[in-house]
Amino acid sequence: MSSTEAKQYKEKPSKEYLHASDGDDPANNSAASSSSSSSTSTSASSSAAAVPRKAAAASAADDSDSDEDIDQLIDELQSNYGEGDESGEEEVRTDGVHAGQRVVPEKDLSTDPAYGLTSDEVARRRKKYGLNQMAEENESLIVKFLMFFVGPIQFVMEAAAILAAGLSDWVDVGVICALLLLNASVGFIQEFQAGSIVDELKKTLANTATVIRDGQLIEIPANEVVPGEILQLESGTIAPADGRIVTEDCFLQIDQSAITGESLAAEKHYGDEVFSSSTVKTGEAFMVVTATGDNTFVGRAAALVGQASGVEGHFTEVLNGIGIILLVLVIATLLLVWTACFYRTVGIVSILRYTLGITIIGVPVGLPAVVTTTMAVGAAYLAKKQAIVQKLSAIESLAGVEILCSDKTGTLTKNKLSLHEPYTVEGVSPDDLMLTACLAASRKKKGLDAIDKAFLKSLIEYPKAKDALTKYKVLEFHPFDPVSKKVTAVVESPEGERIVCVKGAPLFVLKTVEEDHPIPEDVHENYENKVAELASRGFRALGVARKRGEGHWEILGVMPCMDPPRDDTAQTINEARNLGLRIKMLTGDAVGIAKETCRQLGLGTNIYNAERLGLGGGGDMPGSELADFVENADGFAEVFPQHKYRVVEILQNRGYLVAMTGDGVNDAPSLKKADTGIAVEGATDAARSAADIVFLAPGLSAIIDALKTSRQIFHRMYSYVVYRIALSLHLEIFLGLWIAILNNSLDINLIVFIAIFADVATLTIAYDNAPYAPEPVKWNLPRLWGMSIILGIVLAIGSWITLTTMFLPNGGIIQNFGAMNGVMFLQISLTENWLIFVTRAAGPFWSSIPSWQLAGAVFAVDIIATMFTLFGWWSENWTDIVSVVRVWIWSIGIFCVLGGFYYIMSTSQAFDRLMNGKSLKEKKSTRSVEDFMAAMQRVSTQHEKSS
């Protein structure tokens, strides 16, 4: 295998000794560039060793601990065999999220590490760069609460309340104000509970910092740190700013979980970057501060979150659009009524009462309350499934999601290393290779990393190796060396033989053996070919070798390992496809690893390096071609945070509703940008704050279950909105004609009760039995309005027939044994309440049984409306039972007609095309040619970029 092929074996330095070559890894490239840039400051590198430091490294203290009982350690690990480790395997890229940060000139970073900055220089830089803190935008809670009283529907409700107060109709005033307050309170509470991303980010920041100033090591408040400061890092230190390590020959382990969500510590050396809010686990070093405040990685993440959150939610747009159209219709109806009244010289008080009645019924005052309640009940149900909804509108967004951009580790995979079938050279048994690899592992529980845990857990499959392991005595143990990329242990066999065991990056282990003696050509070739094969398939691999006594080094073989897919992921992905959901994997891992994972899951293998998106200067595709490229890709590997943001943005510009999963601060911008941001199990507080939904259960199946539930909730909301718009149109048409033609109207109090009954009964739709759609759902507003208008017209015709046939001068159907107000109130109430049974069904109204809550609420309201009519409450007279029965029978007939119309409209593709302004019959030949040409263009683009 050539050196070029060897370098294609891509591994990550922060994942210990799994690496054959660091040259290809983007994280390493970032570190390398940092090193090269820091080398311009020769004084920093030459004098770093002269800086006064505290002695005693944490690792030295660790070595003083006695070895734990190996049997007990293995048993404890194997008792949890098959469970996911806490240590993440995905390397999350933290190169930056925003190209607009303020870059500190290199001359300001050339500080002498032995002396630090002078007090005068600190003052100058603080004036230039400001304090080391993130900018705050304090928004008054009162103003935020008052904003929930702003909107088309709210304006109409407020106008109606003022008009009712002018007419001294205090009952109406109270009802309207109560609905306004309910809507505002529910919305405000939900937004307040979601919290502030900036507040969560601030919780991760340090309070103090130890720096060198004027040659003295002093402790200062963290917000006084300035760029160019020499800052001390030691075990337990929380980095107060971004910086670059200037101490040579240092070795730090940094906990970046507050940023990346990954619990496995990252290794840092001379020239590497350290990010604000990272915690030093072991080691000591000094760093030069490169960015402070809003210019740090955390600060830029918060800024990008702010940019993403400035867009109005899709659900809010829909409700506002509906409200505006209804407001226009109300104004048109009022103009008709006013014109008729002026020609008849109707009194001003009567005109105002007519105006109040049209205003109340013209705009669904309870629409926000019912929809909010429906989503709140759905959110409570999702919480029982360990999905915490932080923003109610996210339920509607999730129901319409067409593409899910998912991370790999923990969501698609188990988040634990698993060993696969080992490759052994001729004459070596798998048990022998496993024994040697486990001998070269730490015996301390605290010192175990993900690799050692995977080996010790897997001993259950190698009983001979497990039995032999306890018989060896460890004489020396040398943990992972970042230079030689190996772990070394010197042990004594039961026979007293001294054996040196190593495991590490395969090519480095091979080099160790080759330096001792020539390896047979066939063994050498087979070994390298196996390493190359594993690399191409995305496996990480460990080479294993040993040296017995004074003999030669022996190459034993290679142990491949991988973070395996979750057991339910492949099945869940198939289910997602059946639900019309496309899944794209975005991972920080190498392309080979990403492709192998996708192959095992059946996700597709069109996986590309994220550099092709062009953010790092590697892309040259024009806008439309880039959009096609992203749309047809199955995923991207080696992604930085800005790549995730860009992918979401491109897909949204193509008209897709996109969901994004994430767990770290670096994911916060893309979580906020996505239509539905999903914080997965174990996410940082900042990621949770930026997300719309937080999942406490691991895996993709939890997300798919929530998606199905959200579609059920959407079905309830959609059916209610169709129902409620139809009711408003019904009464606008009917009352408008009644006033304009007959100069009469229903009593204003009964109009208010009709509005209240309509919303009180349907509040329980939140608990209704609802199906979930087999594909992403959308509002399809033209179709929604078409159905609502037709249903409203049918209702208006039914009411007009009731008015003009039951009350004739010489005796109608009711033959004057009933009060007009009471009979019309009952007929309107019954037909409107029953309409919900029509719109809630996916097919004929009898095909789906409503929940007992909805059926009970509607029946209860019907009984109350009947009592109103029988006893003449708010009517001029009582109505006999025979007339009431006739009204019920007539209303049932109207209900059946409504059901027939709705079924035809909901199943007719021609109606859908007509409402959306398309021809009734699609020209298939033209459409087929267009689809074929578009597909060929996309395939050509994909082939060109993959070659």
From Swiss-Prot:
> Top-down, what is the taxonomic lineage of the species of origin?
Eukaryota, Fungi, Dikarya, Ascomycota, Saccharomycotina
The UniProt family comment states: Belongs to the cation transport ATPase (P-type) (TC 3.A.3) family. Type IIIA subfamily.
Q: Where is the composition biased (Acidic residues)?
A: 62-74
Gene Ontology cellular-component terms for this entry are: cell periphery; mitochondrion; plasma membrane
| Disordered: annotated segments | 1-103
Q: Which InterPro entries match?
A: ATPase_P-typ_cation-transptr_N, ATPase_P-typ_cyto_dom_N, ATPase_P-typ_P_site, ATPase_P-typ_TM_dom_sf, ATPase_P-typ_transduc_dom_A_sf, HAD-like_sf, HAD_sf, P-type_ATPase_IIIA
- For bias type Basic and acidic residues, the affected ranges are 7-22
For this UniProt entry, what is the primary localization, expressed as one broad class?
membrane
- Kindly report, in one word, the top-level EC class recorded for this enzyme: translocase
* Protein name, UniProt field: Plasma membrane ATPase 2
In its UniProt entry, the species of origin is given as: Saccharomyces cerevisiae (strain ATCC 204508 / S288c)
Topological domain, Cytoplasmic: which ranges? 1-144, 190-320, 377-748, 804-853, 904-947
According to the UniProt entry, which residue ranges have a biased composition of type Low complexity? 26-61
